[in-house]
């Protein structure tokens, strides 16, 4: 170690790079890139953190305490980290060694903290076993007194002499002053930081900053003559009373303990490991193969215990396994050879010189074992004590000591360590759970305050009558057995104060049994015996030094009198009792308790710890489990008890395939199997309890109720006093007038509800079936099925019967037709609180719908199909469900990945019913759009001058850019770490060869991608070959088409559409496109390139139906179209953006030859000579959509032909100007004939302004109108006309009303409009924006009117009001309205304008 208090911080690496390829495959990301970025961030954090020896964290118990707020979803337990010298720093998840200052941020599944510590800082003096002041978590302050102080006792009567003894006082104990210690009568012994009173001989150590030597002296040795000469009896009593923990305990209780101590171990060593005790390891070799050439004793001495499989042994410390033993093998040598870093081996090496000294110093009498030492103080002192006792007193003393020995022997046997679990959990005994610390909170009966306790703190505070409460399987039994085991093993000095510890199971006793009889029957076995008289005398004499661990408590009435008295009249015996009680039963004994300990949920790191030990031979399996729970955070709590962990271990052992599933339902099923095995004798009552609890769970789930009262239980037929009920539910009474009941967890409630629903739907009774259908039909939207009730339905499918499955499948697949449910989706808030991950899922689906309802519908349909097929296959009812499935598939567009479903392998003909399948190929090229939106609009604008309270209406573009750049960087980093995922074509339909049916239409979306690699090309070749028709949509993906040329060459005749945006086509790609004979649709947009070679040869696409050309820079597109272009007689859609120089006659000629034209979009600035264009358009009777962008024509020429377009659905003229009133009136009159019109974007101009009211009235004759836009033409009179028309019953289908940029409307006009607007049941979007020069500052009455207007629009989800200057009070009104709105979760208000300047603040 460097100088104490200093530590050099070199760059270190926590990453196991050799395992990163494997991790990359499991996570689906580039783990090398993630690791590199993570290491850099962690190095920066390390450089900021304080270094140097931290004397305040010498105590392992204190280090353990720092992990109270530590994330439980980790691979290392706090116990492992604290034992390895680490404490939690509070900086992220960083832990730091108190000695060498090593800082670690990550956890490793394959390396324990001690191993990581050893690898990164082998020079750490703590690891090397040097004296750096470490205090073991179970260590105590009281030490064995030295037989002779240095220089004799007499020389230390003077304080100065005592002070001189502290010359070599260790550096780590400088927080306690030698002067204060010497003043309190202590002399430094020269060993560690141990001091001894010159007067009473009391010896103390483990001094920490803030300790008061006088207080410690008074607590542990209150009879000391020197102490009593310096402090009054009142002061001594105050010291004792204010001492934390160890009530009624003095140093004498530790010094004269009968417990045999194991030889000391290196402090970094985890000294409470189950098999640290040699006897325990020896006990595991009972079934060791007799033919093995290696002796058991040698294996045990080398640290190994038998795994029970073949001749495989495992080290209790490092977990290393060895097998295939041969003649002459030396276990210790092999241990050193294969696992040289093992801490146990390091311990032996470090103790090589210490052990002989210890053995000689603490030599045992010949009558006792040589490997242990009797720790009841000086032998002569004990002998004299016995001599002074009377004959009968001596008898109880001898019997008590003999009993103590028998108890310790019993607690270290395998029969005690193994729990009596049924065969479902037989593979996992208590052995694997004893080393796990349960999470405990302490609740003082007379105070409402709760406090989290570490196990050392629990041990320090054991006194009087206490209980440990918890659910079934929460670890109560394991906890009590661990206390007994640690006491017996000699590895826990905190428990030395107890001379007798009785672990008694109350489930196997009768009320007429005596206490001695119970102890003999349960703990002493054959030949063991103790009389009631001697037992009573021992308890009477030892009092606080007797600990009863009472398990399986079920009530006072069933207890024998002796135990009843110990609990209810503890003041008589003054013994210590710790009673394990189910949460439901605590109230029964609350009156007699001083403190209640409550076991919390089993931390996930304990689950990992158990599984790592149990499946050390298959650590990848444990890695997969952790990754599964990273992806499914909502499910992390299912391992809430050790019993559930036992269930998953058993399931993994019995079913190897289960290791890849990690399904939470398996846990619950295993738990229910455990209950059925345990309660075989009462199978019918158990089934009745499960059924009634299932009914309660089902009712609660559909009413979002997860807490119940007695009335709820009674209504469901649940007997709250039935013991079996406590196996499924918990009762909570603290701080409540009436008890509250909860299931073991929200997920477990859903599981039981699922069991009940299946039971109802499968019943022969019509009433049950009807009730089941009633609940099923409450899942009345696709979003509920795939979100709120997704987990529940998954549980139902795991129990689905042949009778129930078709009913569920039919219901689920009909939900996709519920269009309204998607548009009006809202989350169940109570459910979301319990399942935060579900809320994120909901937000994703809702966001997808807002952006693309079509994509959302496809996404939802896919999930409903997957769910339905799970039901069909789990229940073997595919044939019965197929009619519903086939009907569902008809006309659907789904993702390509659905073909991996088994159904498409079994029924490939169903593929023909689909409309299309979609596949997306996404790269990591980024395309920024920031500058395009602002460059031209703001360049001539001056910053607005406004009052200071309105500044929040503007956001500077630099801030917006900064946030945008940050988001862009996050996305870029995310994309970079995720390798391009290939479309999965490994299962289902793809297993068929040859393919009996082809994909009707394949839609290929390619985004931000460069050239395809060979792997992707191979996939596309197979997918293309299985497709009848292929459509491409390419965005920002230059070069991609050329890279997939081999795949296109094989499927030329299948490509029917190619849409390309923001990319440039190479000459090779243009030539490739020209070889596609079946191309029907071609779109090129948002690029400066004019692909002349392609356009010159468009006539070669004989089947072309759609052409869309929107190029930046407005090149003369018409000039490059071939003369033969009019020969494409099938053209249905023509969308052209061209320049003013274009030859208009050429366009006219084209249209003349397109009799089937449905859609015509033109963007240009012709202004004149457009009569011929209008004439030819008038002949296109099938036109459904017309859009003119730019000033394309003289108004009257178009108005004259407008009545011809009787099939028109979309008319977009918002860029056109109608200057005169006559033309505008004629336009308004013509609108009335467009009965099928759905979208109308009204032109601008003075003429339109004058007839705006007439246009509004004419729109009332358009019953299909969904979108209505007025820009720059409305005033107060015309805008109120819209409100009146709506109120009178017009515009019933209107979804989007855009009246933005109408600066002739005054504040009064807006206020009147808001007050009058009503009766628009389907309006989803309202736009009232203004530009910056036309910004409006309104009064409170106008804001109030707007709020009232919004309240009357029940479907509104977007309100645009840029350049409305609103202060804090105004926004409060708007937000209050939003909170109360029916669409409050979806309603978005756009009011903040992004600008490239800061507004001028008026003085």
UniProtKB/Swiss-Prot annotation:
One Gene Ontology term from the biological process aspect of the record: defense response to Gram-negative bacterium
One GO CC annotation: IPAF inflammasome complex
UniProt keywords, alphabetically: Apoptosis, ATP-binding, Immunity, Inflammatory response, Innate immunity, Metal-binding, Nucleotide-binding, Repeat, Zinc
Residue ranges of domain NACHT in the record: 464-759
UniProt-listed CDD domains: BIR
Molecular function terms, GO-annotated: ATP binding; cysteine-type endopeptidase inhibitor activity involved in apoptotic process; metal ion binding
Tissue: Detected in macrophages (at protein level).
Binding site for Zn(2+): 315, 318, 335, 342
InterPro entries referenced in this protein's UniProt entry, alphabetically: BIR_rpt, LRR_dom_sf, NACHT_NTPase, Naip, Nlrc4-like_WHD, NLRC4_HD, P-loop_NTPase
The keyword Transmembrane helix is assigned to this record: no
Residues reported to bind ATP: 473-478
Endpoints of the signal sequence: none
UniProt repeat feature BIR, residue ranges: 60-127, 159-227, 278-345
Keyword ATP-binding carried by entry: yes
Subunit relationships: Component of the NLRC4 inflammasome, at least composed of NLRC4, caspase-1 (CASP1) and some NAIP protein. Flagellin binding by NAIP5 triggers assembly of the inflammasome, a huge complex that contains a single NAIP5 chain and multiple copies of NLRC4. (Microbial infection) Interacts with S.typhimurium (Salmonella) flagellin.
Function: Sensor component of the NLRC4 inflammasome that specifically recognizes and binds flagellin from pathogenic bacteria such as Legionella or Salmonella. Association of pathogenic bacteria proteins drives in turn drive assembly and activation of the NLRC4 inflammasome, promoting caspase-1 activation, cytokine production and macrophage pyroptosis. The NLRC4 inflammasome is activated as part of the innate immune response to a range of intracellular bacteria.
Protein name (record): Baculoviral IAP repeat-containing protein 1e
Taxonomic source organism: Mus musculus
């Amino acid at each position: 170690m460097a100088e104490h208090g200093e530590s050099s911080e070199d760059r270190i690496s926590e990453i196991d790079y050799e395992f990163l390829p494997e991790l990359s495959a499991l996570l689906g990301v580039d783990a090398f890139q993630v690791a590199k970025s993570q290491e850099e961030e962690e190095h920066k954090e390390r450089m900021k953190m304080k270094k140097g020896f931290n004397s305040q964290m010498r105590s392992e118990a204190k280090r353990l305490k720092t992990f109270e707020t530590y994330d439980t979803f980790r691979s290392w337990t706090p116990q492992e980290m604290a034992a390895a010298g680490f404490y939690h720093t509070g900086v992220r998840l960083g832990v730091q060694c108190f000695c060498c200052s090593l800082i670690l941020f990550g956890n490793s599944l394959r390396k324990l903290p001690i191993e990581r510590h050893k690898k990164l800082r082998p020079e750490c003096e703590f690891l090397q076993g040097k004296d750096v002041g470490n205090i073991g978590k179970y260590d105590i302050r009281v030490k064995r007194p030295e037989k002779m102080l240095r220089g004799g006792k007499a020389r230390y009567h003077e304080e100065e002499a005592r002070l001189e003894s502290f010359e070599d006082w260790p550096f780590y104990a400088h927080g306690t002053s030698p002067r204060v210690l010497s003043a309190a009568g202590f002399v430094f012994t020269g060993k560690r930081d141990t001091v001894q009173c010159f007067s009473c001989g009391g010896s103390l150590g483990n001094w920490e900053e803030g300790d008061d030597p006088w207080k410690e002296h008074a607590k542990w040795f209150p009879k000391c003559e020197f102490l009593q000469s310096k402090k009054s009896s009142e002061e001594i009593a105050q010291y004792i009373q204010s001492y934390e923990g160890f009530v009624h305990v003095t140093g004498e209780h530790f010094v004269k303990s009968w417990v045999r101590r194991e030889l000391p171990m290196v402090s970094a060593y985890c000294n409470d490991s189950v098999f640290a005790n040699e006897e325990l390891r020896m006990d595991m070799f009972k079934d060791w193969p007799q033919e093995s050439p290696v002796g058991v004793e040698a294996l045990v001495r080398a640290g190994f215990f038998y795994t029970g499989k073949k001749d495989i042994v495992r080290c209790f410390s490092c977990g290393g396994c060895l097998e295939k033993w041969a003649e002459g093998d030396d276990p210790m040598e092999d241990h050193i050879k294969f696992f040289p870093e093992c801490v146990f081996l390091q311990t032996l090496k470090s103790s090589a010189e210490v052990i002989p000294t210890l053995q000689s110093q603490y030599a045992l009498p010949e009558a006792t074992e040589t490997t242990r030492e009797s720790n009841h103080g000086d032998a002569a002192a004990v002998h004299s004590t016995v001599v002074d006792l009377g004959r009968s007193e001596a008898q109880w003393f001898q019997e008590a000591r003999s009993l103590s020995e028998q108890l310790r022997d019993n607690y270290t046997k395998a029969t005690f360590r193994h729990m009596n679990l049924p065969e479902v959990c037989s593979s996992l005994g208590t052995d694997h759970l004893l080393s796990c610390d349960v999470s405990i909170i302490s609740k003082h009966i007379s105070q409402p305050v709760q406090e989290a306790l570490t196990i050392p703190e629990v041990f320090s505070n054991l006194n009087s009558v206490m209980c440990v409460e918890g659910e079934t399987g929460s670890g109560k039994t394991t906890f009590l057995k661990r206390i007994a085991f640690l006491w017996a093993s000699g590895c826990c000095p905190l428990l030395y104060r107890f001379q007798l510890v009785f672990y008694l199971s109350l489930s196997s006793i009768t009320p007429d049994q005596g206490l001695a009889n119970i102890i003999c029957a349960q703990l002493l076995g054959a030949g063991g015996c103790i009389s009631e008289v001697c037992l009573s005398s021992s308890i009477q004499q030892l009092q606080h030094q007797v600990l009863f661990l009472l398990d399986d408590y079920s009530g006072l009435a069933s207890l024998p009198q002796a135990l009843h008295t110990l609990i209810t009249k503890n003041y008589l015996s003054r013994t210590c009792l710790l009673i394990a009680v189910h949460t439901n039963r605590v109230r029964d004994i609350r009156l007699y308790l001083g403190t209640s300990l409550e076991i919390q949920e089993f931390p996930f790191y304990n689950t990992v710890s158990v599984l790592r030990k149990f499946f050390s031979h298959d650590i990848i399996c444990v890695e997969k489990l952790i990754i599964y729970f990273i992806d499914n955070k909502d499910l992390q709590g299912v391992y809430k008890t050790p019993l559930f962990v036992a269930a998953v271990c058993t399931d993994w052992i019995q079913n190897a395939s289960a290791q890849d599933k990690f399904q939470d339902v398996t846990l619950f099923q295993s738990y229910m199997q455990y209950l059925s095995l345990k309660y075989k004798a009462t199978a019918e009552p158990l089934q009745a309890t499960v059924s009634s609890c299932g009914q309660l769970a089902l009712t609660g789930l559909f009413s979002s109720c997860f807490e119940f009262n007695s009335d709820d239980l009674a209504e469901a037929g649940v007997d709250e006093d039935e013991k079996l009920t406590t196996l499924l539910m918990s009762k909570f009474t603290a701080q409540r007038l009436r008890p509250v009941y909860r299931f073991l967890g929200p997920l477990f409630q859903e599981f039981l509800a699922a069991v009940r629903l299946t039971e109802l739907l499968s019943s022969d009774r019509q009433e049950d079936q009807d009730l089941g259908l009633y609940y099923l039909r409450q899942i009345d939207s696709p979003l509920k099925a795939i979100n709120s009730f997704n987990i529940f339905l998954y549980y139902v499918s795991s129990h689905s019967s042949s009778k129930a499955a078709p009913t569920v499948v039919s219901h689920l697949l009909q939900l996709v037709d519920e269009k309204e449910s998607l548009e009006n989706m809202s989350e169940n808030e109570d459910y979301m609180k319990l399942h935060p991950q579900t809320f994120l899922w909901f937000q994703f689906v809702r966001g997808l719908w807002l952006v693309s309802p079509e994509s959302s519908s496809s996404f939802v349909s896919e999930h409903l199909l997957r769910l339905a097929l799970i039901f069909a296959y789990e229940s073997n009812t595919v044939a019965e469900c197929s009619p519903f499935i086939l009907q569902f598939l008809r006309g659907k567009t789904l993702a390509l990945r659905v073909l991996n479903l088994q159904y498409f392998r079994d029924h490939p003909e169903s593929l023909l019913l689909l409309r299309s399948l979609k596949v997306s190929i996404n790269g990591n090229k980024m395309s920024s759009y920031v500058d395009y939106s602002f460059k031209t609009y703001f360049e001539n604008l001056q910053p607005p001058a406004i009052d200071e309270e309105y500044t929040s209406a503007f956001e500077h573009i630099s801030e917006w850019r900064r946030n945008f750049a940050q988001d862009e960087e996050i996305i870029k980093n995310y994309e970079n770490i995720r390798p391009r995922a290939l479309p999965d074509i490994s299962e289902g339909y793809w297993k068929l060869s040859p393919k009996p049916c082809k994909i009707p239409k394949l839609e290929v979306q390619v985004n931000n991608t460069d050239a395809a690699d060979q792997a992707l090309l191979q996939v596309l070749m197979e997918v293309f070959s299985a497709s009848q028709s292929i459509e491409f949509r390419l965005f920002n993906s230059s070069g991609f088409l050329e890279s997939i040329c081999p795949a296109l060459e094989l499927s030329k005749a299948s490509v029917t559409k190619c849409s390309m945006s923001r990319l440039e086509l190479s000459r090779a790609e243009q030539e490739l496109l020209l070889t596609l004979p079946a191309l029907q649709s071609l779109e090129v947009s948002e690029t400066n390139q004019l692909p002349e070679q392609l356009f010159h040869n468009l006539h070669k696409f004989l089947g072309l139906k759609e052409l869309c050309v929107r190029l930046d820079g407005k090149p003369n597109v018409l000039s490059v179209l071939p003369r033969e272009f009019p020969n494409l007689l099938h053209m249905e859609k023509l969308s052209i953006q061209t320049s003013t120089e274009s030859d208009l006659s050429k366009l006219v000629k084209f249209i003349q030859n397109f009799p089937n034209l449905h859609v015509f979009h033109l963007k240009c600035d012709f202004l004149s000579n457009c009569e011929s264009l209008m004439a030819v358009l008038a002949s296109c009777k099938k036109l459904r959509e017309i859009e003119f962008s730019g000033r394309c024509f003289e108004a009257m020429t178009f108005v004259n032909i407008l009545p011809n377009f009787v099939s028109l659905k979309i008319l977009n003229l918002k860029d056109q100007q109608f200057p005169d009133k006559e033309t505008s009136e004629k336009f308004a009159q013509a609108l009335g004939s467009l009965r099928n019109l759905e979208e109308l974007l009204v032109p601008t101009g003075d003429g339109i302004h004058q007839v705006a009211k007439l246009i509004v009235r004419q729109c009332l004759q358009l019953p299909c109108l969904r979108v209505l836009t007025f820009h720059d033409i409305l005033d107060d009179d015309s805008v109120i006309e819209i409100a009146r028309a709506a109120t009178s019953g017009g515009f019933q289908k209107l979804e989007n009303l855009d009246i933005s940029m109408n600066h002739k409307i005054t504040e009064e006009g807006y206020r009147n409009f808001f007050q009058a607007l009503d009766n628009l049941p389907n309006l989803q979007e309202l736009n009232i924006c203004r530009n910056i020069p036309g910004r409006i500052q309104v009064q409170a009455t106008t804001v109030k009117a707007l709020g009232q207007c919004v309240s009357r629009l029940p479907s509104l989800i977007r309100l645009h009001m840029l350049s409305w200057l609103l202060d804090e009070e105004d926004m409060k009104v708007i937000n209050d309205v939003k909170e109360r709105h029916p669409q409050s979760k979806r309603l978005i208000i756009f009011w903040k304008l992004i600008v490239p300047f800061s507004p001028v603040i008026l003085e």
